[in-house]
């Protein structure tokens, strides 16, 4: 009777498996392991390991992205009629994307330009201007990031198990690189008073050219007034010809004038002597 009761109790209440037996080592027994139990067991041990590795490993992207966004530090200067010089602060990031487009065309950009991975300062040339000199409002947006390239873990370093399938390697613009954009609204008419616009100030070259041309005009004006003088003087009667004619005639001795004669008498005597000399030179031989 007792052996029968012992057999019934053993059949009704099976003993739990001992540790280290075939149940703990599914590879040693021919039966496949329990999938649900194995998954729960693995999950219980892998979750703390993931948390520990994530807490111990330093973040791949340092604090500049987690810091609050810096205020917009963007300045725009007008260099020429259709060019702009843009500057922004380095704390916004290492590599920046710049967008420039017009905003006063009722939802349609009259002019738009994009620059990828540029640094300050940036010169934007061939700026589209509105027809008829109309007011043109523009918006400038600068977005910067702190990633220079794909960050790779050092060889042999333990890595956490990914919770999702890893993305295939590719360009950063395909990986959704974060950008912090900061925009500035301005008008081209407001930039005309900027000191950087060269059209509002006279360069030294223009001043020198103006001075040189003024000097040339003055010299030519003086020369134009002087050069006709010798030509006009050639048509005037020359006193040298009369002197040569008088020297070629025989010199007549002037008559002696008494000391007591007056000036009128002396002049009359001189005129008579001159007439006699002319008459003697013209008389036929």
Curated annotation (Swiss-Prot):
Keywords in alphabetical order: Glycoprotein, Membrane, Signal, Transmembrane, Transmembrane helix
Record keyword Glycoprotein present: yes
Primary localization: membrane
Tagged with keyword Kinase: no
GO-annotated molecular function: peptide binding
Membrane association type: Multi-pass membrane protein
Family: Belongs to the TMEM158 family.
The name this protein goes by in its record: Transmembrane protein 158
Lineage: Eukaryota, Metazoa, Chordata, Craniata, Vertebrata
């Amino acid at each position: 009777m007792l052996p029968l009761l012992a057999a019934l109790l053993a059949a009704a209440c099976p003993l739990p498996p001992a540790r280290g037996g075939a149940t703990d080592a599914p590879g040693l027994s021919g039966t496949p392991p329990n999938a649900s139990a194995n998954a729960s067991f693995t999950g219980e041990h892998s979750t703390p390991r993931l948390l520990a590795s994530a807490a111990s490993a330093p973040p791949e992207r340092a604090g500049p992205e987690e810091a609050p966004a810096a205020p917009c530090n963007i300045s725009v200067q007008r260099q020429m009629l259709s060019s702009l010089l843009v500057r922004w602060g380095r704390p916004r990031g290492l590599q920046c994307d710049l967008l420039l487009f017009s905003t006063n065309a009722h939802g349609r950009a009259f002019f738009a330009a994009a620059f990828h991975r540029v640094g300050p300062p940036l010169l934007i040339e061939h700026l589209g201007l509105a027809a008829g000199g109309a007011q043109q409002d523009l918006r400038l947006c600068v977005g910067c990031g702190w990633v220079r390239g794909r960050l790779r873990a050092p060889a042999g370093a333990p890595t956490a198990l990914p919770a999702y399938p890893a993305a295939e390697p590719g360009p950063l613009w395909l990986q959704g690189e974060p950008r912090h954009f900061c925009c500035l609204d301005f008008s081209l008419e407001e930039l005309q008073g900027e000191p950087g616009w060269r059209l509002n100030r006279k360069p030294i070259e223009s001043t020198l050219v103006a001075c040189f041309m003024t000097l040339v005009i003055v010299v030519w004006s003086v020369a134009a007034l002087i050069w006709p003088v010798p030509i006009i003087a050639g048509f005037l009667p020359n006193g040298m010809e009369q002197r040569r004619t008088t020297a070629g005639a025989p010199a007549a001795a002037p008559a002696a004038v008494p000391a007591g004669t007056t000036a009128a008498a002396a002049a009359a005597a001189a005129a008579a002597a001159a007439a006699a000399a002319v008459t003697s030179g013209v008389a036929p031989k």
